C-alpha cells in the first residue's frame, strides 16, 4: 500500500474547508424564518379584519392591554405619543378580557390612532404566551423579536421610545 502525502497548498486548502464546515462558514447564513406567531387573524375594534402576516418584514410593536389595567392606563398616553412620533413602525394594540365598548372607550380616551384588535377569546394572547398585561412584542424588520412583560409597573415613555428607535437602527 502506498501513502500519498498532500502538497502544502492542498493541505492548507483542505484545512480551510474543514474549518469552514466545522464552524458553519461554508454557506451564506440562511434568511431568518418567518415568525409563525404572526400567522393570526383578528378583528379591529371597528370590525375590520386584520391579518397578522401583514406585519412580516416590517418593524412593529404589539401592545397587549386591557382597559381596566392600571398600568395599561398609565402607559397609554406614552404609547400614543411614541406611535405618532414613529410612523415607520407599525403599532398594533391587542386588547382582551373586556367588552368591546370598554375597549373602544379606552382607545378614544387615550387617542390611540393605530390599529387595535378585539381579542375577545384571548387566542392572540395565547399565541404569544402573554400571561398578563401590559406586555409588548417588538419586531425588527428581519423578523427577530423581543417580548417584554412587566406586570408590576408601566413602561416609561422613554424606555418605549428607546426600544422603538432600536427597531429601525
Feature-to-residue mapping (PLM):
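Thiol/disulfide oxidoreductase modules built on the thioredoxin-like
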Residues: 108-112, 120-166
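N-terminal "domain-start" segment that seeds a small globular fold
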Residues: 22-52
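Hydrophobic beta-strand anchors of alpha/beta hydrolase catalytic cores
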Residues: 61-62, 91, 136
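Short active-site neighborhood of thiol/selenol oxidoreductases, capturing the structured segment around
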Residues: 51-73
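Structural microenvironment flanking redox-active thiols in thiol-disulfide oxidoreductases
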Residues: 73-110, 120
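Short loop/turn microsegments at loop-to-beta-strand junctions
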Residues: 38, 60, 133-134
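Secretory targeting and sorting signals
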Residues: 1-32
